[in-house]
Structure formats: C-alpha cells, structure tokens
C-alpha cells in the first residue's frame, strides 16, 4: 500500500530535504505524463546522490580492469588468462567480479569471440588468433554497488568486414547515447541504434538488451533496440542503465548453447559485435559512468 507524502515530510529519495523542496514537482510532472499513457519509472529506479557516488567508485575498478586488458590482450593468449586478470585485479582493488556465481555462471568475465554474441565462457582451449574479434564484458561489485561495461578488441590482422562491424556497433552506441536526455524515452535511443545498424546492412539482436544497474546487477528497465521514438519508458534524472546493442553481421537469429545454457551464438555463424556503456541520466543530459 502506497503512503502519501506530505509537503513537509522528508523526501522519498533520502536527500534529507522536505518533499516540497525536492521531488514534489518532479512527481507531479511524472503523474501528468503517466496520465497521458506513457510508461514512467518507479521511485526505486531513481538513484540518489549517495548511491550514485558509490556506483561511480565501482565503475573506477571496472574501467581500470578493461584499460589493463586493452593494453595486454594479444594473439596467442587464451581467454582463461583474461578471466584470471579480471579476478585478480578486481579483488586486489577491493571489488568482487559480479558475474562469478551469478545464477550459476562459473567465471569472472564473459569473453565472446567472433560468432559468439554474448556470455562466452573463458577457456584455456580458446586461444586468440589473428583475425579474431572478441568482446570482453566486465562487471564489478564494490561495497554493494554494481558497474558493468564491455569493449571489443581486434586481434592481429582483422578483415575489413569484421573491423567495419566493430566500428559501426560502436557508432550505434554513440548515436544512442546522444538521444539520452531527461524527459525523453528509451525508444528514442533504441531507434537511433537500430536505424544505424540497419542502414549499414546489419541486424540488432532482439532477445537480449541493456538493463538498469547500480544497486543490483540487472534491474528494470529492460533496454531494447527494436523500438520506436517516443515509445518505451520515460528517461528521468537519476536513472542508470546500460546501452549494449549486439549487432550481427548477418541474420538476427541467435541460439543458446544447450551444453551450458549460457553461451549465445549467431544462427548463421557470422560474427557479432557488442560495446557496452553505463549511463546516468542527469538534469541536463547524461553522464557516461563506465565504458
């Protein structure tokens, strides 16, 4: 049962301010927009200043780990070595790898090579070869706060076709980011991502998308990219989520490896690419917290 907040009561956000001096006008605007049929966020999706500060500290570890991998990933390296780097660096800095034991996932990182769309298992048997593209997806818990981002890496002499896929996927993220602003919609961002991929002859995975993040590994809302401008949930200050489209060189169809129920592949065996950033909606735009 919801309890009505009085104008002079402490605001629900935890700022310590009176409701009338903090989020009352905000809530009234949200209620008006909801009355017009739009999907609006609940209060629990809006982070306060203390939570944002804690999340930013977690992001520092995540960025440092990916920066290190970017400098040291190389041909001949196996992906189990990447997993060890992620575990060792994260724990040395006081964090916990968020994927480790998450819903039974047995590793500290996801390493997805070529036609692997996401959730690739690190392995001593997966040795990086010249011509490979790989997504390294790192997620960190620090003092109960979560961060999540991924980058693509080209190993050795990569074909122009694969390089273009990697570059266009990054452009999709950048174009989607430009659409993130308060009182816009997730559909604005999703359509920008989808349209750029489609214009370049690619497809965007439908079944897997971005998500809210910060207090949990995966929070609402689910963030899709086959959406229309002006649709989906409203973007408001304090929301934190990932933009992480998975863009396929060929057909959109994917499948999950039945041997482990984790690793996702393209149905046609053609490469897939993904970049992931973590974004905060601010009062006047957005801030990228993790990349």
What residue spans do the PLM features occupy?
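Active-site neighborhoods and metal-handling regions in enzymes and metal-associated proteins
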Residues: 6-8, 15-291
